[in-house]
Amino acid sequence: SRMVKFYSKESNMVAIHAIPGHFATSHSHINYYIDITSLKTRIQEAKEVARVLHQKIGRVSYVDTIVCMDGTEVIGAFLAEEFEKGDMASTNRHETIYVVSPEMNSNNQLLFRDNIKPSIAGKHVILLSASTTTGKTIHRSLEGIRYYGGVTEAVASVFSTVNEMDGFQVHAVFHAEDLPGYAAYTAQDCPFCKKGIKLDAVVNGFGYSKL
Protein backbone atom coordinates (compact mmCIF):
# COMPACT_ATOMS: atom_id res chain seq x y z
CA SER A 1 0.00 0.00 0.00
CA ARG A 2 2.99 2.30 0.54
CA MET A 3 4.19 1.53 -2.96
CA VAL A 4 4.72 4.49 -5.31
CA LYS A 5 4.74 4.09 -9.10
CA PHE A 6 7.09 6.07 -11.34
CA TYR A 7 6.79 6.10 -15.14
CA SER A 8 9.64 6.41 -17.60
CA LYS A 9 9.91 9.72 -19.46
CA GLU A 10 10.28 7.74 -22.68
CA SER A 11 7.34 5.35 -22.38
CA ASN A 12 4.15 5.09 -20.35
CA MET A 13 4.43 1.30 -20.67
CA VAL A 14 7.52 1.30 -18.45
CA ALA A 15 7.12 1.90 -14.72
CA ILE A 16 9.05 1.02 -11.59
CA HIS A 17 7.57 0.57 -8.14
CA ALA A 18 9.31 2.18 -5.19
CA ILE A 19 8.63 1.16 -1.60
CA PRO A 20 9.81 3.62 1.09
CA GLY A 21 11.61 2.20 4.11
CA HIS A 22 15.04 1.19 5.39
CA PHE A 23 16.80 -1.31 3.14
CA ALA A 24 20.32 -2.71 2.83
CA THR A 25 22.09 -3.66 -0.39
CA SER A 26 25.51 -5.32 -0.39
CA HIS A 27 27.18 -1.90 -0.61
CA SER A 28 24.76 0.68 0.81
CA HIS A 29 21.62 1.49 2.78
CA ILE A 30 18.75 3.00 0.79
CA ASN A 31 15.42 4.66 1.65
CA TYR A 32 13.47 3.11 -1.25
CA TYR A 33 13.36 -0.44 -2.50
CA ILE A 34 13.19 -0.19 -6.29
CA ASP A 35 11.02 -3.04 -7.55
CA ILE A 36 11.51 -3.74 -11.25
CA THR A 37 10.21 -7.32 -11.16
CA SER A 38 7.46 -6.70 -13.72
CA LEU A 39 9.93 -5.06 -16.13
CA LYS A 40 12.13 -8.17 -15.96
CA THR A 41 9.39 -10.79 -16.09
CA ARG A 42 6.47 -9.47 -18.17
CA ILE A 43 7.17 -9.90 -21.86
CA GLN A 44 5.56 -6.68 -23.16
CA GLU A 45 7.22 -4.55 -20.47
CA ALA A 46 10.62 -6.19 -20.95
CA LYS A 47 10.34 -5.60 -24.69
CA GLU A 48 9.57 -1.90 -24.13
CA VAL A 49 12.46 -1.51 -21.64
CA ALA A 50 14.77 -3.03 -24.26
CA ARG A 51 13.50 -0.58 -26.89
CA VAL A 52 14.14 2.40 -24.58
CA LEU A 53 17.61 1.14 -23.61
CA HIS A 54 18.49 0.55 -27.27
CA GLN A 55 17.60 4.19 -28.02
CA LYS A 56 19.68 5.39 -25.07
CA ILE A 57 22.74 3.30 -25.95
CA GLY A 58 22.65 4.59 -29.52
CA ARG A 59 24.92 3.39 -32.26
CA VAL A 60 27.39 0.64 -31.39
CA SER A 61 29.67 -0.63 -34.16
CA TYR A 62 29.78 -4.23 -32.98
CA VAL A 63 27.63 -6.27 -30.61
CA ASP A 64 28.40 -9.96 -30.16
CA THR A 65 27.19 -10.68 -26.64
CA ILE A 66 24.91 -9.21 -23.98
CA VAL A 67 25.98 -10.12 -20.44
CA CYS A 68 22.89 -10.06 -18.18
CA MET A 69 23.18 -9.46 -14.45
CA ASP A 70 20.45 -9.73 -11.79
CA GLY A 71 17.96 -11.76 -13.82
CA THR A 72 17.74 -9.39 -16.79
CA GLU A 73 17.91 -12.13 -19.45
CA VAL A 74 14.41 -11.46 -20.82
CA ILE A 75 15.25 -7.77 -21.34
CA GLY A 76 18.65 -8.85 -22.72
CA ALA A 77 17.05 -11.08 -25.35
CA PHE A 78 14.79 -8.26 -26.54
CA LEU A 79 17.74 -5.84 -26.48
CA ALA A 80 19.66 -8.25 -28.72
CA GLU A 81 16.66 -8.29 -31.05
CA GLU A 82 16.64 -4.46 -31.17
CA PHE A 83 20.32 -4.41 -32.16
CA GLU A 84 19.79 -7.11 -34.79
CA LYS A 85 16.96 -5.07 -36.34
CA GLY A 86 19.42 -2.24 -37.01
CA ASP A 87 22.55 -2.22 -39.11
CA MET A 88 24.72 -3.46 -36.26
CA ALA A 89 27.65 -5.69 -37.16
CA SER A 90 28.71 -8.80 -35.28
CA THR A 91 31.92 -10.81 -35.37
CA ASN A 92 29.91 -13.98 -34.59
CA ARG A 93 30.07 -16.40 -37.50
CA HIS A 94 26.39 -17.29 -37.03
CA GLU A 95 25.56 -13.54 -37.21
CA THR A 96 23.38 -13.52 -34.12
CA ILE A 97 23.96 -12.20 -30.60
CA TYR A 98 24.71 -14.30 -27.52
CA VAL A 99 22.71 -13.54 -24.36
CA VAL A 100 24.51 -14.97 -21.32
CA SER A 101 24.54 -14.72 -17.53
CA PRO A 102 27.61 -15.22 -15.37
CA GLU A 103 27.77 -17.10 -12.11
CA MET A 104 29.29 -15.35 -9.10
CA ASN A 105 32.02 -17.01 -7.06
CA SER A 106 32.40 -16.72 -3.26
CA ASN A 107 34.32 -13.44 -3.70
CA ASN A 108 31.45 -11.97 -5.76
CA GLN A 109 33.56 -12.14 -8.92
CA LEU A 110 32.14 -13.07 -12.31
CA LEU A 111 32.58 -16.68 -13.35
CA PHE A 112 32.01 -17.92 -16.90
CA ARG A 113 32.21 -21.69 -17.38
CA ASP A 114 34.24 -23.19 -20.21
CA ASN A 115 31.16 -23.68 -22.41
CA ILE A 116 30.25 -19.96 -22.08
CA LYS A 117 33.80 -18.53 -22.39
CA PRO A 118 33.73 -18.51 -26.23
CA SER A 119 30.84 -16.02 -26.10
CA ILE A 120 33.04 -13.59 -24.12
CA ALA A 121 36.66 -14.03 -25.28
CA GLY A 122 37.44 -11.57 -28.07
CA LYS A 123 33.78 -10.53 -28.26
CA HIS A 124 32.15 -7.08 -28.21
CA VAL A 125 30.00 -7.05 -25.09
CA ILE A 126 27.12 -4.99 -23.70
CA LEU A 127 26.75 -5.22 -19.92
CA LEU A 128 23.14 -5.12 -18.69
CA SER A 129 22.12 -4.85 -15.04
CA ALA A 130 18.86 -4.34 -13.17
CA SER A 131 19.57 -1.80 -10.45
CA THR A 132 22.76 0.13 -9.74
CA THR A 133 23.18 2.08 -6.50
CA THR A 134 26.95 2.40 -5.97
CA GLY A 135 28.36 1.09 -9.26
CA LYS A 136 30.53 -1.49 -7.48
CA THR A 137 28.76 -4.41 -9.16
CA ILE A 138 29.24 -2.77 -12.57
CA HIS A 139 32.91 -2.18 -11.75
CA ARG A 140 33.38 -5.86 -10.80
CA SER A 141 31.46 -6.99 -13.87
CA LEU A 142 33.61 -4.86 -16.19
CA GLU A 143 36.71 -6.34 -14.54
CA GLY A 144 35.33 -9.85 -15.07
CA ILE A 145 34.49 -9.27 -18.74
CA ARG A 146 38.00 -7.89 -19.25
CA TYR A 147 39.53 -10.89 -17.42
CA TYR A 148 37.73 -13.31 -19.76
CA GLY A 149 38.94 -11.39 -22.82
CA GLY A 150 35.78 -9.49 -23.66
CA VAL A 151 35.64 -5.90 -24.95
CA THR A 152 32.86 -3.89 -23.31
CA GLU A 153 31.08 -1.61 -25.79
CA ALA A 154 28.34 -0.18 -23.54
CA VAL A 155 26.87 -0.41 -20.04
CA ALA A 156 23.11 -0.35 -19.43
CA SER A 157 20.94 -0.58 -16.33
CA VAL A 158 17.19 -0.37 -15.81
CA PHE A 159 17.69 1.88 -12.75
CA SER A 160 20.94 3.62 -11.84
CA THR A 161 22.07 6.31 -9.44
CA VAL A 162 25.47 6.23 -11.17
CA ASN A 163 25.98 8.08 -14.46
CA GLU A 164 29.48 6.84 -15.22
CA MET A 165 31.71 3.95 -14.17
CA ASP A 166 35.29 3.17 -15.24
CA GLY A 167 35.01 5.52 -18.22
CA PHE A 168 31.68 4.09 -19.42
CA GLN A 169 28.45 6.05 -19.42
CA VAL A 170 25.73 4.06 -17.63
CA HIS A 171 22.69 4.18 -19.92
CA ALA A 172 19.61 3.87 -17.69
CA VAL A 173 15.84 4.03 -18.13
CA PHE A 174 15.47 5.51 -14.63
CA HIS A 175 17.91 7.67 -12.65
CA ALA A 176 17.81 8.74 -9.00
CA GLU A 177 16.40 12.15 -10.01
CA ASP A 178 13.33 10.36 -11.43
CA LEU A 179 12.51 9.29 -7.85
CA PRO A 180 12.07 12.39 -5.67
CA GLY A 181 13.68 11.87 -2.27
CA TYR A 182 15.64 8.73 -3.19
CA ALA A 183 18.86 8.49 -1.18
CA ALA A 184 21.64 5.96 -0.68
CA TYR A 185 24.07 5.99 2.26
CA THR A 186 27.04 4.02 3.47
CA ALA A 187 26.14 1.80 6.42
CA GLN A 188 28.22 4.09 8.66
CA ASP A 189 26.36 7.25 7.58
CA CYS A 190 22.83 5.81 7.43
CA PRO A 191 20.42 8.14 9.29
CA PHE A 192 17.99 5.27 9.94
CA CYS A 193 20.69 3.21 11.66
CA LYS A 194 21.75 6.24 13.73
CA LYS A 195 18.16 6.56 14.97
CA GLY A 196 18.03 2.85 15.78
CA ILE A 197 15.44 2.11 13.07
CA LYS A 198 15.61 -1.56 12.10
CA LEU A 199 16.04 -2.72 8.50
CA ASP A 200 12.85 -3.65 6.64
CA ALA A 201 14.62 -5.96 4.21
CA VAL A 202 17.88 -6.94 2.56
CA VAL A 203 17.77 -6.33 -1.19
CA ASN A 204 19.82 -7.22 -4.25
CA GLY A 205 19.30 -7.25 -8.01
CA PHE A 206 17.02 -10.28 -7.75
CA GLY A 207 14.64 -8.88 -5.14
CA TYR A 208 14.21 -8.51 -1.40
CA SER A 209 14.06 -10.65 1.73
CA LYS A 210 12.15 -9.23 4.69
CA LEU A 211 13.85 -9.31 8.08
What does each model-found stretch correspond to?
Residues 1-62, 205-211:
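Active-site-facing substrate-recognition patch
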Residues 57-59, 113-119, 187:
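Short amphipathic alpha-helix with an adjacent loop that forms part of the alpha/beta core around
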Residues 1-9, 142-211:
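PRPP-dependent phosphoribosyltransferase catalytic core
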Residues 60-72:
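Short glycine-rich phosphate-binding loop at a beta-alpha junction
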Residues 63-64, 123, 153:
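Conserved acidic residues
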Residues 73-126, 133-137:
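Short, glycine/charge-rich flexible loops or terminal/linker lids adjacent to PRPP-binding catalytic cores
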